[in-house]
Amino acid sequence: WMAAENADIQPDDTVAVWGCGPVGLFAIQSAIVMGASRVIAIDHYPNRLALAKQLGAEIIDFRETDVREALMEMSGGIGVDAVIDAVGMESHGFAIDNMFDVVKQKVGMGADRASALKQAILAVRFGGKVSIPGVYGGMTDKWPLGAMMEKGLQVRGGQTHVQKYTKQLLEKIEDGTLDTTFLISHRLPLEQAAEGYKNFKEQQNEWTKVILKPGMEN
């Protein structure tokens, strides 16, 4: 919700969301609730893209499509109104600069991979809005600062302000404005937490959100 709010979504906005994990999917749902007329989801896991489509988003598989070209075409050559990077430093692009980021990480130079954020900045329209809920743990280079300045973009990021949002979001869940159940892929007893984390990391197409329940029978 905060990711969508940071994107300052207005009625009839076109919004692009990178990443269809739990954060990205909830950002998609939130953007639609806030009045976006069009939401475009970018990922490559089929099941996660299917969940985004189920919510009402149009989908782009970044392994099959040039994302920036597709977004420019879908927005009439202008660029989308707002972009949300729900990927962060785990971004896996195919551009040559992303390969350099991987090499630098291997040798301990610690550059975060930021291909999703770079795509987002280049795909948003002039005067557009950039929201960054995706986590970046260190430093990144090849930042498209020139494009950001030239376009006059608004950039906001940060982890969710839990105390600010918890009460209002629980109310929206209770009154049916938001649905959280669609995202739950697995329910496990608390004793299987380690196994759940391992599967979530290694099988991201099938595992989206795990509920751990103390006392649950195996």
Question: What role is predicted for each listed range?
Answer:
Residues 1-65, 69, 84:
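Mid-domain Rossmann-like dinucleotide-binding core that forms the NAD(H)/NADP(H) cofactor-binding site
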Residues 7-9, 50, 55-154:
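Glycine-rich cofactor phosphate-binding loops and adjacent beta1-alpha1 units
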Residues 155-156, 172:
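Rossmann-like dinucleotide-binding domain for NAD(H)/NADP(H)
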Residues 45, 136, 161:
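Residues in the short beta-alpha loop(s) of Rossmann-like NAD(P)-binding domains
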Residues 78, 118, 162-218:
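C-terminal hydrophobic helical "lid"/dimerization subdomain
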Residues 16, 40, 129-131, 156, ...:
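Structural detector of well-ordered beta-strand residues that form the stable sheet scaffold
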